[in-house]
């Protein structure tokens, strides 16, 4: 199986190589905006996490693993490759979809073939502690806007929130942040549950009752990788500013925070909790823009007067043993 994976990977014909001469941070501190943040460790046993939410399981065979695995997008092989390279780590795969019995058996077989792979069904986890009723969010925002002076009040936004409140009260008064995202399609739902899993950290593996996870400590962290991130070697022990880092996309002279990699050294990291607070306080919050980027910028006090490029460099997850964002070289097959 190892040779098949390696052979498959070698056929991808990527035109780039791993970023050369990366200097990985070691223990010490990192400075942003005049504040020193300790570089906290994620050791070699911190679990990795991949995620695959499949909207259309019928596009796979009845007894096939329902994760894309083509020459252009070898996502399943990337997961297997990570499990082979990082034998000492638990490799979580958070899945969701209306899978057939045969597809579930195929996922169970994957766990037997690679004992450090742990398939976790999203429906097996309890996210109620991170939930909030939409009506409460709307009512709080209505009160906040109505308390503003009339000359600065956003009447259009106020009207839209009142419409949303009326719709919720009419159709489903118990509708919540979690249940509403469960109805969403596309990357928004994908991103939302990723954030919640990372808030749980290692606790999610323990909650799911996965065999062989007894070595994970409650309250520990997790390293999320998009399935198009390709490992070429062990990650080792990582040192991150206050125990968190994310992927940074670089295109030409521009850069942006991305959620293709999110690494945290502990459950309920305060930056992600701040992002959840924003989601709880905004009428139309976004799990990427608010839950990740907003949470990071609030927690590390990165305001508009600070240099965004400097913040990206500060919070960036860097590693010479990862090919970053390989889907940008082909076409993402997630749909």
From Swiss-Prot:
User: In UniProt terms, what is the effect of altering residue 259 to A?
Assistant: Abolished protein-arginine N-acetylglucosaminyltransferase activity
Q: How is it modified after translation?
A: Auto-glycosylated: arginine GlcNAcylation is required for activity toward death domain-containing host target proteins.
The main location class comes to secreted
GO terms for CC?
A: extracellular region; host cell; host cell Golgi apparatus
Instruction: Name the phenotypic consequences of knocking out this gene.
Output: Decreased apoptosis in infected macrophages, characterized by reduced CASP3, CASP8 ans CASP9 caspase activity.
Cofactor(s) demanded = Mn(2+)
Ligand binding (Mn(2+)): 228, 325, 327
Keyword set includes Transferase: yes
Q: Where is this motif: DXD motif?
A: 226-228
The record's top EC class is: transferase
The record's EC number reads 2.4.1.-
Q: Where is UDP-N-acetyl-alpha-D-glucosamine bound in this sequence?
A: 51-53, 75, 224-227, 327, 332-335
What Pfam families does the database record attribute to this sequence? Answer: SseK_NleB (PF24688)
Specify the domain of life of the species encoding this protein. Answer: Bacteria
Can you say where in the cell this protein is located?
Secreted; Host Golgi apparatus
- Supply one GO molecular-function term: toxin activity
Q: Give the catalysed reaction(s), semicolon-separated.
A: L-arginyl-[protein] + UDP-N-acetyl-alpha-D-glucosamine = N(omega)-(N-acetyl-beta-D-glucosaminyl)-L-arginyl-[protein] + UDP + H(+)
Provide the glycosylation site positions: 153, 184, 305, 335
Family per similarity comment = Belongs to the glycosyltransferase NleB family.
Annotated domain remarks: Adopts a GT-A fold and acts as an inverting enzyme that converts the alpha-configuration in the UDP-N-acetyl-alpha-D-glucosamine donor to the beta configuration in the N-linked (GlcNAc) arginine product.
Question: What functional role does this protein have?
Answer: Protein-arginine N-acetylglucosaminyltransferase effector that disrupts TNF signaling in infected cells, including NF-kappa-B signaling and apoptosis. Acts by catalyzing the transfer of a single N-acetylglucosamine (GlcNAc) to a conserved arginine residue in the death domain of host proteins such as TRADD, TNFRSF1A/TNFR1 and TNFRSF10B/TRAILR2: arginine GlcNAcylation prevents homotypic/heterotypic death domain interactions and assembly of the oligomeric TNF-alpha receptor complex, thereby disrupting TNF signaling.
Assembly and binders: Interacts with host TRIM32; without mediating its GlcNAcylation.
Protein's recorded name: Protein-arginine N-acetylglucosaminyltransferase SseK3
- Organism annotation: Salmonella typhimurium (strain SL1344)
What does the organism's lineage look like at the top?
Answer: Bacteria, Pseudomonadati, Pseudomonadota, Gammaproteobacteria, Enterobacterales
């Amino acid at each position: 199986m190892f040779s098949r994976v390696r052979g498959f990977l070698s056929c991808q014909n990527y035109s780039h190589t791993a970023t050369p001469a990366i200097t990985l941070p070691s223990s010490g501190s990192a400075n942003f905006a005049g504040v020193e943040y300790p570089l906290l460790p994620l050791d070699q046993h911190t679990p990795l996490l991949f995620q695959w939410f499949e909207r259309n399981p019928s596009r796979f065979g009845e007894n096939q693993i329902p994760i894309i695995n083509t020459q252009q997008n070898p996502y399943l092989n990337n997961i297997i490759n990570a499990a082979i390279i990082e034998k000492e780590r638990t490799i979580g795969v958070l899945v969701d979809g209306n899978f057939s019995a045969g597809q579930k058996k195929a996922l169970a077989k994957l766990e037997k073939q690679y004992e450090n792979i742990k398939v976790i069904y999203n429906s097996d986890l309890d996210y109620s502690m991170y939930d909030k009723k939409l009506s409460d969010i709307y009512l709080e925002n209505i009160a906040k806007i109505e308390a503003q002076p009339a000359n600065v009040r956003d009447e259009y936004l106020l009207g839209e929130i009142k419409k949303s409140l009326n719709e919720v009260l009419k159709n489903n008064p118990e509708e919540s942040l979690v249940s509403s995202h469960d109805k969403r399609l596309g990357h928004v739902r994908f991103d939302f549950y990723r954030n919640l899993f990372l808030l749980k950290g290692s606790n999610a593996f323990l909650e799911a009752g996965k065999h062989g996870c007894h070595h994970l400590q409650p309250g520990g962290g997790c390293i999320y990788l998009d399935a198009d991130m390709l490992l070429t070697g062990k990650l080792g022990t990582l040192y991150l500013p206050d125990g968190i880092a994310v992927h940074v996309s670089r295109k030409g002279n521009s850069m942006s925070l991305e959620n293709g990699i999110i690494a945290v050294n502990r459950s309920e990291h305060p930056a992600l909790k701040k992002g959840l607070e924003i989601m709880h306080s905004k009428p139309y919050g976004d799990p990427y823009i608010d839950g990740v980027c907003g949470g990071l910028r609030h927690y590390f006090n990165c305001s508009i007067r600070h240099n965004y490029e400097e913040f990206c460099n500060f919070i960036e997850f860097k590693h010479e043993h990862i090919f970053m964002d390989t889907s940008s070289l082909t076409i993402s097959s997630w749909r």
